[in-house]
């Protein structure tokens, strides 16, 4: 049977539904999960569904080691309740160089110079290249909503050091 049975098919024409099925190379008997809503929540829910289905259908080879480097994190996460950005990693993580020019114009699109090592779905290590520019660090503190007193009290030693220059540096921690 090649018919579509869903709670959302009433919102699409038959032509639209066929285009969706063709786009994903769907065949009769396939099941598609389509979700809409807030991107972060949608991705988390679909990820949980993927893992649950893999467990139920015994699709996970527990004898196989599957390491993965995750390298394209957003630098910031927007909190809708507080109407401000938070650091995804920490406030000293540098943006990837090609995203520096977007810090002011589109901070939500800036990608962090960070990395996690994941083994079979579990994070086993994480790190980043740190900010080594005074101006960039000040801009990040500003985007995080920190005032001068706040960042000076907490990180005055770092700010002072950055005024004199620092080499690019980074690290990774396991555990």
Please identify what each model-predicted range represents.
Residues 1-174:
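Structured aminoacyl-transfer and RNA-binding surfaces used for tRNA recognition/handling
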């Amino acid at each position: 049977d090649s018919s579509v049975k869903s709670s959302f098919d009433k919102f699409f024409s038959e032509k639209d539904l066929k285009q969706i099925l063709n786009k994903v190379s769907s065949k009769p008997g396939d099941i598609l999960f389509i979700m809409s809503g807030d991107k972060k929540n949608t991705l988390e829910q679909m990820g949980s569904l993927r893992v649950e289905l893999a467990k139920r259908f015994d699709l996970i080879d527990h004898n196989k080691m599957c390491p993965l480097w995750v390298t394209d994190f957003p630098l910031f996460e927007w909190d809708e309740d507080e109407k401000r950005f938070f650091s995804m990693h920490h406030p000293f993580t540098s943006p990837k160089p090609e995203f520096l020019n977007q810090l002011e114009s589109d901070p939500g699109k800036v990608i962090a110079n960070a990395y996690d090592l994941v083994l079979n779905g579990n994070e086993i290590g994480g790190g980043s290249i740190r900010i080594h520019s005074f101006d960039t660090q000040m801009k990040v503190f500003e985007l995080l909503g920190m005032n001068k007193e706040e960042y000076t009290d907490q990180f005055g030693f770092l700010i002072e050091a950055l005024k004199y220059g620092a080499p690019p540096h980074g690290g990774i921690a396991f555990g």
